[in-house]
Each structure stands twice: as C-alpha cells, then as structure tokens.
A protein has these predicted regions:
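N-terminal periplasmic/intermembrane-space "pro-region" immediately following the signal or transit peptide
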Residues: 2-6, 14-16, 20, 25, ...
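Extracellular/periplasmic loop regions
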Residues: 73-82, 86-97, 304-305, 331, ...
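Short loop/turn motifs that connect adjacent beta-strands in outer-membrane beta-barrel proteins
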Residues: 96, 101-119, 155-161, 198-205, ...
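Membrane-embedded beta-strand positions of outer-membrane beta-barrel proteins
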Residues: 119-121, 166, 207-209, 239, ...
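Transmembrane beta-strands of outer-membrane beta-barrel pores
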Residues: 123-131, 168-174, 211-215, 243-245, ...
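Surface-exposed loop and membrane-interface regions of Gram-negative outer-membrane beta-barrel proteins
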Residues: 129-148, 156-204, 219-224, 261, ...
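Signature for the C-terminal beta-barrel architecture of outer-membrane proteins
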Residues: 200-207, 220-379, 436, 449-453, ...
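Outer-membrane beta-barrel "beta-signal"
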Residues: 496-508
Length: 508
C-alpha cells in the first residue's frame, strides 16, 4: 500500500513539541544480552516452524502457463517498506533463485500463487560518535555508541485482496549512557495490520487497519524516523483510493509510545492524534501535485510562551517531478488553530531543486535546498507563531537543529562513481526567522537561554555522506558533519559539534 501519507540519523522524540523530554532508561549488559537472545530465538523459532513447508518447486505446475509472459524481477528490499514486497514472483520457476527462498515464498495453495506466506529479516548495526549533542548545552551528551536494530516479519497474503503483516523488533544501544525512548526497545511489535484491496469504480480501493509505519510526502514534516533504533509507528486506520492519475488518501493515526520496561509494552499515545485527507494527481512520469488537510491534536503541549492543549489545522501543498535532468520538490504548509488561550498562526516552506548532468561521467547533481519556518515574533501578543514540524526527518537538517524558527540554505553536490555508489558533499547556513524565539534543536526542543538573544545567525555546517549498495541484501553508509555555531548558541553555553556515523545493514 504505497500511500505515503504520513530517515536518517535523528534523536526524534515520541511527540513533537517543545515538551516531552526524554527519560533515561536503566539497563545492564546482561539484561540486554538476555533480551536479545530471547528476540533471536523467537525469530529462529518462527523460521524453523515454517521450514517444513512446501518448496518453491511445488509451484512449478501453477507456473507452467507463465512461459509466454516476461520474467518478473525479484522485489527490491527496502527496510522501511517490507510490507510492499510481492514474493509471488517466486511462483515462476524462471525467476533466479537464492538460498532460503523456500521461506521467502511458502505457497498455501499451488493453484493460486498469490496465496502465500513470506518471512523476512532486517539487521542494522550503526556506530555513532557525537562530539556535542544539543551543541553541548541543555544536558547534551557526548560519546560514542552502537545502535543495533533487529527486525523480523511474517507477511501472509490471501490472494490479491487480503494481507496480514506482522513485524517484531529488538533494538539495543550498547555504550549509550543516557537512553532515550527511541534508543532501546528489546522486544515489541513494530507493525501488525490487516490490509484489504478491492477494485472499485474503475480504480483500486485499499484499506489498512492496525499498527504500521507510514510517511507523508518528502518526509520533511512526517518521516518514518529511519535513523534512530526505533522507527515511528502509528496505530492507524488508512483508506486509499487510486484511479488513473488520481490518488485520494484518508488517515486517522495515533503515534506509538515506545518503552522498555517489559516485552510488548508499547502503547498508543491517546493524547496525540493526527488525521486528514490527501489528494494527489500524477501528470506524467514523476511529475505530481498534491494537497492535504490534517488536524493535529496534542494535549498538554508546552512551548516557551504558552502551555495547553494544542489544536492545529494544517493545509499542505506540494509539487515534485523531474524533467530532462531537472528535479524539484517544493512544499508549503500553513498551520492555524489554538493552544490554551492563544491562537496559532505558523507557516513553513521547504524546497529542494537540482540539476543532473546525465551525460557526464559520475552523473553529478548540483542541488539547492531552501527552507523557511516561522517562529514566535512576540511571546506576549496572545498568538503563537512557532511552526510545529510534526514528525520531522533528522537528516534533512543534519540532525542538530529543528525546523521551528528557521531559515536554511544548503547547496550540495552528489556524484555516482559507480551505479551502486553515491557521494554527497554539502554546506549549509542557518538563521533564526526571528530572534524573539529560541534556537530549536532536533526535533523541536527550544535551546535554553537563546530566545530574545540578539543575532539571527545560528551557524554553518558541512556534511559528507556516502552510500554503497553492495548487493541487494547488504548496504554500507557513512555520514560526517561539522557544525560551527553562531553567537546565540555560544552565549547559551554551546560549542561547535562533530558527528560521525558508520552503518552496515542487511535485509532478507
């Protein structure tokens, strides 16, 4: 269900506002080892239970009529989109085989290739060295640690119409002294939903109910939170109708709060609800225009100038596409509503434009990102102007600053020395939209003692990132950032920051 309604090294909190500080969790090394062994044995038991199932060869009779059809490719494995894979391709004996395909495609009825069970695993090991989280101010942490994430899933397809998808997770953070809720969850359900697909009125209707990972658009303001150990899951109901170039999506979502006290103790956050409707039209190729309305409800939200129940009505318009080397993604968002006795009026604009020299060696892409989000210009005027970035993407701003009260200009150069390798170098300048509001650190925490301090300049950072897809199953990534702070952060007790991340991932 490629709805993409509601990334990245980030330290995203469970809810996005100036409140909800992270609470360190106590743990011992022997507890982590015991819980990880339990998770591993659970995954191994699931695989062993199904290992007796019929082999792929048993589907050859059902696939004999496929000889006149083109050979379909094996699904591409993406860690955040495992539920979208269609492994019925393995019902065709002409498709190239790999080890353990007998567990990747377990036919339930050889006469109906679309009825099957598929098992899968993700493993990600990430080393991080962070010289100054939160620029060394606001109880920031410095040090080095490992983020280790293990996921395993079962995907049951009952023909073309019914899907039952369940994914478990085991995440630990050895070496991290101060654990946040997104760092560790030793055994819990990441996704568990039922999906229904039906033809309707010349189009396709898709319904999905349960716990799931979802994203909005470019993931500026609502990402899957790929970087930390724990992705952002939602207990949600989704309806998706697609016909021709038109796509209409409705959603009601409650983000899942993670905790690590007992196995399977994550729960829906009933004090934070996001609902809305999106309409999208694809003109040709990748060119599209979309708009959505969303209602954001957060109880007991805290900002620098006001506390109360936050209610935002959100209107977002986005266009994206690519034509002859030129690509673009431009998005504008308006937020209105109330919090406590104050009204809310905030805006943001996000843009990324690039041009790729497709006929030049290494296919260099020259890109420019420009982003603006409002802050609160007058804390005493009974109107809150601070933009709420909802569930933002950490990588987008190098994971140091947040989107509220921001001006961000970032030129970048990306090259491809090999088809499976990309290298990106970027430098960015950041300013506050207004000095009356604070500097915000990721995801949207106000840095103490920065509101009202003269000087809009926040700092400049340089970033280098490399990605290498070694095989369809293995990938390697490297990321390095140096952030030179401005005067407002320095007066608040901050210092320049450095970050290095090295990541190895595996998907089966």
């Amino acid at each position: 269900m490629n709805h993409r309604f509601v990334a990245a090294r980030d330290e995203s909190s469970q809810v996005i506002s100036a409140s909800d500080p992270s609470t360190p969790l106590e743990r011992t090394d022997h507890q982590i080892g015991r819980w990880r062994r339990q998770a591993f044995f659970a995954a191994a038991s699931l695989i062993a239970t199904c290992s007796y199932c019929p082999s792929i060869a048993s589907t050859q009779d059902a696939a004999q009529d496929n000889t006149a059809q083109p050979v379909r490719e094996r699904p591409k494995i993406r860690a955040d989109r495992r539920s979208e894979e269609d492994w019925s391709v393995l019902a065709d004996p002409r498709v190239a085989r790999e080890p353990l395909d007998g567990l990747k495609y377990i036919p339930l009825d050889t006469a109906h290739p679309k009825m099957y069970l598929s098992l899968g695993v993700n493993l990600r090991e990430r080393f991080e060295l962070d010289h100054a989280t939160f620029f060394g101010a606001a109880s920031g942490e410095s040090g080095q640690w490992i983020l280790s994430r293990l996921e395993w899933h079962a995907d049951l397809r009952l023909g073309n119409h019914v899907q039952l998808f369940t994914q478990f997770q085991n995440a630990v953070a050895p070496g991290k002294a101060r654990l946040k809720p997104v760092d560790q969850d030793r055994l819990d359900v990441e996704q568990a939903f039922i999906g229904l697909t039906e033809p309707l009125g010349g189009g396709t209707l898709r319904l999905r109910l349960g716990r799931q990972v979802v994203a909005i658009e470019f993931q500026r303001f609502a990402s899957v939170r790929e970087g930390p150990n724990l992705r952002q899951s939602y207990d949600a109901a989704l309806a998706d109708y697609e016909r021709g170039g038109w796509h209409v999506i409705g959603a009601y979502e409650q983000p899942v709060r993670t905790q690590d006290v007992h196995p399977f103790d994550d729960y829906s956050n009933h004090h934070l609800i996001l609902s809305g409707v999106k309409v999208q039209h694809r003109f040709s190729g990748s060119t599209q225009l979309s708009a959505y309305y969303a209602n954001y409800r957060h109880d007991d939200a805290v900002f620098t100038s006001v506390t109360g129940n936050e209610r935002r009505n959100i209107i977002d318009i986005r266009t994206s596409g690519a034509v002859k080397g030129l690509d673009w993604d431009v998005e504008g968002m308006n937020q209105s509503g109330s919090i406590g006795a104050q009204t809310i009026q905030a805006e943001a604009l996000g843009s990324s434009v690039g041009y790729t020299l497709v006929d030049v060696r290494w296919k260099p892409r020259m890109g420019l990102a420009v982003d603006v989000a409002t802050g609160d210009h007058d804390p005493s005027d009974n109107r809150l102007g601070t933009f709420n970035p909802l569930f933002p993407n950490g990588y987008y701003l190098a994971d140091y600053t947040g989107f509220p009260n921001l001006i961000h200009v970032k030129p970048a150069l990306t090259v491809h020395p090999a088809p499976a390798v990309s290298l990106t170098a970027a430098v960015a300048g950041q300013w506050r939209e207004t000095t009356a509001d604070a500097v915000y650190v990721f995801p949207s925490f106000p840095l103490p003692a920065t509101a009202g301090v003269p000087g809009r300049y926040t700092g400049t950072y340089g970033e280098f990132r490399g990605d290498w897809t070694i095989t369809p199953h293995y990938a390697l990534a490297f990321d390095a950032v140096h952030y030179a702070i401005g005067n407002a952060i320095r007066q608040a007790g901050g210092r320049d920051a450095n970050y290095v991340g090295i990541q190895v991932s595996y998907g089966w």
